[in-house]
From Swiss-Prot:
GO molecular function: histidinol-phosphate transaminase activity; pyridoxal phosphate binding
Protein name: Histidinol-phosphate aminotransferase
Native species: Methanosarcina barkeri (strain Fusaro / DSM 804)
PTM annotation (N6-(pyridoxal phosphate)lysine): residues: 226
Pfam families for the chain: Aminotran_1_2 (PF00155)
The enzyme's E.C. designation: 2.6.1.9
């Protein structure tokens, strides 16, 4: 007889709120009886151009070698990342699955039962999951009205048990950048690691990675899911002090980056034109959406915009758009985001025009 055995599960696991992803094309097609080919998916901040053709070819070329393990430490990819970022290989970690794998590895490396992590909200929901799984406790600090952080408030929330402070720049779901002076203040007044999530940094005017050369407690996480269009391959990387990278590699799961992901990542880094075009579409798209959507739209440095549909509710407006085959993200699942915010990915001009018309209709009908 097979019985449920919850006593075998770590108690910390039961405190974890399940991660809520954006809706899939299949879900919406089934729910509303739509042709999947007609659906516009702008809820997960994916690249509307798709992956680089060079990356696609590189993936295909690995098929005959599926029986062979990739390099344990993804050294070829790290060498390519060194050329891309300007950092030595000794400062670079490649991670699968995606940047989430980097977060998992970092929490596993430093968090013990009873330790704390600081999470300014609203922000990317995943940070607390690996921390809780390792026995850590998330301490949430509410962002200001404009979604900026108050460094003093953040530092006041730390304690002797604080191991990681999670920051996001551009922040998800608000799209605003973390000022360098605020990051420096946090770094200089804590013994904890400070993790800066730069998943969307290629779309922004500036990055914060260079500070890794100055501070031995700064880690910058990045992904191939956004500008490189490789979300389905689950590939990320970290830029961190050499002392930490050595220990991370010691504790990391070997072969975490698959051979197709490794080769596609190298090829994507080499395709400068695809990257430039992806950035151009995102920047033009977010500008268009900010100007045309008939609700308050926050300034963004990412490949998405945050829309406040007050006095309407985000769920109702999101549902109105989904009925028309347009997937956007209601932000009510983001802690402290409230119930009136919607995140919409910047798509192609044709897609953006349809999104604007759908928001206009929702404003009249919802």
């Amino acid at each position: 007889m097979f019985l449920s055995r919850p006593e075998l599960i770590k108690k910390e696991i039961f405190d974890i709120a399940e991660y809520v992803p954006g809706k899939s094309i299949e879900e919406i097609a089934s729910a509303y009886g739509l042709d999947p080919a007609s659906i516009i998916k702008l809820g997960s901040n994916e690249n509307p151009l798709g992956p680089s053709p060079k990356a696609v070819q590189a993936m295909m070329d690995t098929a005959p070698f599926a029986n062979i393990y990739p390099s344990a430490d993804a050294i070829e990819l790290r060498e390519a990342l060194s050329r891309y970022t300007g950092f030595p290989v000794s400062n670079l970690i490649a991670s699968g699955p995606g940047m989430d794998g980097l977060l998992d590895g970092l929490c596993r490396l430093v968090i013990e039962k009873g330790d704390e992590v600081i999470v300014p909200t609203p922000t990317f929901a995943y940070y607390e999951l690996p921390a809780r799984a390792c026995g850590g406790k998330p301490v949430f600090v509410r962002r200001s009205q404009d979604f900026s952080i108050d460094p003093e408030k953040l530092l006041e929330a730390t304690s002797s048990r604080t191991k990681i402070i999670f920051l996001c720049s551009p922040n998800n779901p608000s799209g605003n950048l973390l000022p360098e002076k605020d990051l420096r203040k946090v770094l200089e007044n804590t013994r904890a690691l400070v993790f800066v999530d730069e998943a969307y940094v290629e779309f922004a005017d500036r990055n914060l990675a260079e500070l890794v050369r100055e501070y031995d407690n700064l880690v910058v996480g990045r992904t191939f899911s956004k500008v490189f269009g490789l979300a389905g391959l689950r590939l990320g990387y970290g830029i961190m002090p050499e002392w930490l990278a050595k220990e991370y590699i010691r504790a990391a799961t070997p072969f975490s980056v698959s051979l197709p992901a490794l080769k596609a990542g190298i090829a994507a880094l080499s395709d400068v034109e695809h990257r430039k075009k992806s950035i151009e579409i995102a920047r033009e798209g977010r500008k268009y959406l900010k100007e045309k959507i008939p609700f308050k739209v926050y300034p963004s440095q990412a490949n998405f915009v945050l829309v406040d549909v007050s006095p309407l509710k985000a769920k109702a407006v999101t549902q109105s758009l989904m009925k028309k085959g347009i997937i956007v993200r209601s932000c009510d699942s983001f802690r402290d985001a409230g119930d009136t915010l919607i995140r919409a990915t910047a798509g192609t001009l044709e897609q953006n025009e349809k999104v604007v018309r759908a928001f206009e209709t929702a404003k009249k009908e919802v």
